[in-house]
Each structure stands twice: as C-alpha cells, then as structure tokens.
Amino acid sequence: MKQYRDHYFKRAKKENYPARSVYKLQELDKRFKVFAKGQNVMDLGAAPGSWTLFAAKKVGDTGRVLAVDIQSTDTAFPDNATFLQADVFEDSPELLAAMDKQLPYDLIISDMAPKTTGVKFADQANSLELCERARDIVPSRLKQGGHFIVKIFDGPDVKEYIDSLRKMFSKVKRFKPKSCREESKEFFIVGLGFRGIEG
C-alpha cells in the first residue's frame, strides 16, 4: 500500500502539483465529465492548491476559479485562478465579495476535511459539518444545471446527507477514486444537474 501511495506522490511532484489529491479530481472528472472550457468554478478547501491548478487548466483562459481555504498556500496560481484565505463558516465581507464576483458558478467542488482526531465518530461528525456548509453555499451561487462535488467521511449520517442532495440535483452519485487509500473512510458525492431546492 505504501508503494501504491508513493506512486501518486512521485507522479504529483513530477507533474508540478503540490499534492497527490489532484488524481482524485482527475478520476472524478473522467467518470462524470464535470469540467468544460469557460466555466466558473468554486474550489472549497483548496490548499495546497492541486485541485485549483487542475481546475484552472480544465476551464482554460476564458474560465475562472475561485479557491478558498482557511489555510494559506505558497502555490503559484495562473491568472485565471484566485486564492482567498478565509473561513467558509464566517461570512466575511471579503469572502462574500469574492464569491459573488463570479456568479453564477458552473461547478462547486469541495475537498474540505477536518483535522482528524483518531476518534472515528468525531471525525465523521466534523466531516459532515464541512459538507453541510459546502451544500449550503450551493443554492444561491450554483447555476441551474450546474454540478457539485464534495468529499465526505463515511458514517451513519451520510444517507441523510445524500437524500438532501437528491432534492437539489437530477442525479446524485457516490464515488471512491482508485487514488484514495483503500483503508480510508473518505469518498466523494457528486451532484449532477442542479435543479434548485424543492419546496
């Protein structure tokens, strides 16, 4: 397993990505075809920036990527990507202005993850809280027909979370990329075709 992980780490370094997580997004795009040239994309939990770099490349010069993370990063981003260090749980004027500048979004992606404690229940609960925050950003900023990708730790509350997304999207899928560690509890939920919120 260590050799398997090292493969992705070395590949990321060779291809100038700051983290191996880029290959998870690459697999997600290959499976669900969520990216296109000219899109507006919001990347939550963006540091150190691999997903942002991949997204910027996929949307091209006519697209825009807004990357947000509570942590800073030294990664250099292309002109079509903007990185903002901010807490998504705090609606600061700077964060709201940055989010609203590119409205509407074609795609919102979230690789947000909590600092793990080793306590399974606590880690799952903290992951769910981040996923709920990402979901709450969707209604006012994702365009009709847009897509949503969110990382979540598997647990008893996942079904209820998925059910909430089914009320918002035409299709909702679970997907665990091959580049995820086999023993990892993380997987991704993909919402395709945003319809709005059912009343």
Swiss-Prot record:
Top-level taxon of the source organism: Bacteria
Subcellular location(s) per record: Cytoplasm
Any one annotated GO CC term: cytoplasm
Entry keyword set: Cytoplasm, Methyltransferase, rRNA processing, S-adenosyl-L-methionine, Transferase
InterPro entries on file: RNA_methyltr_RlmE, RNA_MeTrfase_FtsJ_dom, rRNA-MeTfrase_E, SAM-dependent_MTases_sf
Pfam families in the cross-refs: FtsJ
Catalysed reactions listed for this entry: uridine(2552) in 23S rRNA + S-adenosyl-L-methionine = 2'-O-methyluridine(2552) in 23S rRNA + S-adenosyl-L-homocysteine + H(+)
E.C. number: 2.1.1.166
Protein family membership: Belongs to the class I-like SAM-binding methyltransferase superfamily. RNA methyltransferase RlmE family.
Name of the molecule in the record: Ribosomal RNA large subunit methyltransferase E
